[in-house]
């Protein structure tokens, strides 16, 4: 079974013996630097200096759909969460962290904002690091007026991102007033507190949020600029009379 993105066709596959809904496509080995590299490589449509170089997975000397392979896994190696509680005199603090390690994300937004081909729309400043003869170590293929080499029309490993993250899911800090102060407002006890959710996310993923919701029963980790989890802060007071 294969699941599809909206522009690049099939991006995931489910089969016996493999992770559920793993990412499937062409494996990018790098960028062709010169004509000699093109000539030495397997036959590949659109091959030229500045274009992606794909892996000849089956070794038949021709790059085509038969060379699609596993390029990522949206399933994490492990999930974790832990609570921490502290108190000192009248102060108390509790927090909950959770995270995901080892999962990949297919960044579908890159198909639009990072494409080396311009179609009368805005692009990310990241494409300024596009390949030129004087910039051979570029991250992106050479800029072009057309999409070449199936670079941004077929699923490939260029769009796979590390989706690992650690998130401060909740934090509460409280201060219990001394009884002498609480009694002045006619209370037996009073506690002021701050409560926050989704305050901090530690991740290498550059999108809005690495915690990507499932896009289908067999399409996980497909990032299309979904709105991130919101951060919420509140103040409160608990009073007992």
Show which residues each predicted segment covers.
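Extracytoplasmic gating/loop element in the C-terminal half of outer-membrane beta-barrel translocons
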Residues: 18-22, 35, 46-47, 100-191, ...
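Outer-membrane beta-barrel pore domains and translocons
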Residues: 87, 98-100, 195-199, 240
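Membrane-embedded beta-strand positions in outer-membrane beta-barrel channels/transporters
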Residues: 81-83, 170-174, 234-236
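Repeated loop/turn-to-beta-strand initiation elements of outer-membrane beta-barrel proteins
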Residues: 90-95, 180-181
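C-terminal beta-signal and terminal closure region of outer-membrane beta-barrel proteins
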Residues: 6-36, 128-130, 134-138, 203-241
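Membrane-embedded beta-strand positions of outer-membrane beta-barrel proteins
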Residues: 95, 192-194, 237
């Amino acid at each position: 079974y294969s699941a599809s993105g909206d522009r690049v066709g099939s991006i995931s596959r489910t089969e016996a013996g493999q992770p559920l809904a793993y990412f499937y496509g062409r494996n990018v080995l790098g960028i062709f630097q010169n004509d000699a590299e093109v000539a030495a490589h397997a036959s590949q449509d659109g091959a030229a200096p500045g274009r992606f170089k794909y892996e000849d997975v089956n070794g038949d000397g021709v790059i085509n759909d038969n060379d699609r392979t596993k390029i990522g896994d949206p399933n994490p190696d492990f999930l974790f969460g832990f609570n921490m509680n502290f108190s000192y005199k009248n102060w108390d603090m509790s927090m909950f962290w959770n995270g995901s390690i080892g999962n990949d994300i297919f960044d579908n937004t890159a198909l639009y904002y990072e494409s080396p081909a311009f179609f009368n729309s805005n692009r990310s400043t990241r494409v300024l690091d596009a390949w030129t003869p004087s910039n051979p170590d570029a991250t992106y293929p050479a800029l072009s007026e057309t999409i070449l080499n199936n670079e941004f029309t077929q699923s490939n490993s260029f769009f796979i991102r590390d989706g690992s993250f650690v998130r401060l899911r909740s934090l509460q800090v409280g201060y219990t007033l001394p009884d002498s102060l609480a009694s002045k407002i006619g209370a037996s006890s009073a506690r002021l507190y701050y409560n926050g959710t989704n305050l901090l996310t530690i991740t290498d993923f550059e999108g809005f949020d690495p915690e990507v919701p499932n896009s289908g029963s067999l399409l996980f980790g497909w990032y299309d600029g979904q709105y991130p989890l919101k951060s919420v802060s509140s103040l409160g007071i608990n009073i007992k009379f």
